[in-house]
From Swiss-Prot:
GO cellular component entries: chloroplast thylakoid membrane; nucleolus; ribonucleoprotein complex
GO terms, molecular function: mRNA binding
Keyword hit for Nucleus: yes
Organism: Arabidopsis thaliana (Mouse-ear cress)
Record GO biological process: pseudouridine synthesis; rRNA processing
Keyword line: Nucleus, Ribonucleoprotein, Ribosome biogenesis, RNA-binding, rRNA processing
Region (Disordered): 1-37, 144-202
Summary of subunit composition and partner proteins: Component of the small nucleolar ribonucleoprotein particle containing H/ACA-type snoRNAs (H/ACA snoRNPs).
Stated name of the protein: Putative H/ACA ribonucleoprotein complex subunit 1-like protein 1
Biased composition (Gly residues): 151-160
Domain of life per record: Eukaryota
Region (RGG-box): 6-48
Length: 202
């Protein structure tokens, strides 16, 4: 499948830019707004795309949910968490963009993909699959509460950036980087009390 090329017009929803007042992805006050549990942002913006070449292997990481302001909002289909800014591919290893922000409950997380120039998020349909280099994934356990004296391992190396990861609440949470969330909320599902929030980079 070849990546779709840019067409005319951007995504627009009802009641504001994308279905809500003030929120980038449809809610009040937050970029991925809604009502309910806390969520957060991820790696922030990055300038340009560096061609790293296709990996030797790709695995499914997410399915398309909807487009918003040029980005693709996707639901994580992996048990592991992608690195911020990790390249995202089609099944044929054609790169279409990079991981931009991760948000939502830990057990049903979503992330947005910043599309490469010339590729349009609105050209994808719900359920379309996206892929990632398996070496760009981190174990979920790295973001859950750990007993004192224990640390989580797994591939991916130590976290890079200004933030840290620490569990909060019975379900655990992701807290990374510079300050609080941007004010939006995302409803948790499945009874999980954990969530992704904060800004930072792996």
């Amino acid at each position: 499948m070849r990546p779709p090329m840019r067409g005319g017009g951007g995504f627009r929803g009802r009641g504001g830019r994308d279905g809500g007042g003030g929120g980038r992805f449809g809610g009040g006050g937050g970029r991925f707004g809604g009502g309910g549990g806390r969520f957060g942002g991820g790696g922030g913006r990055f300038g340009g795309f560096r061609d790293e070449g296709p990996p030797s292997e790709v695995v499914e990481v997410a399915t398309f949910v909807h487009a918003c302001e040029g980005d693709a909002v996707t639901k994580l289909s992996q048990e592991k968490i992608p690195h911020f800014n990790a390249p995202i591919y089609l099944e044929n290893k054609t790169q279409i963009g990079k991981v931009d922000e991760i948000f939502g409950p830990i057990n049903e997380s979503l992330f947005s993909i910043k599309m490469m120039e010339g590729i349009v998020a609105t050209s994808y349909s719900p359920g379309d699959k996206f892929f990632i280099d398996p070496y760009k994934l981190l174990p979920l356990a790295r973001f859950l509460p750990q007993p004192k004296g224990q640390s989580t391992g797994g591939r991916g190396g130590a976290g890079r950036g200004r933030g840290d990861s620490r569990g909060r609440g019975r379900g655990g949470s992701f807290s990374r980087g510079r300050g609080a969330p941007r004010g939006g909320r995302f409803p948790p599902r499945g009874g999980s009390r954990g969530s992704f929030r904060g800004r930072g980079r792996f």
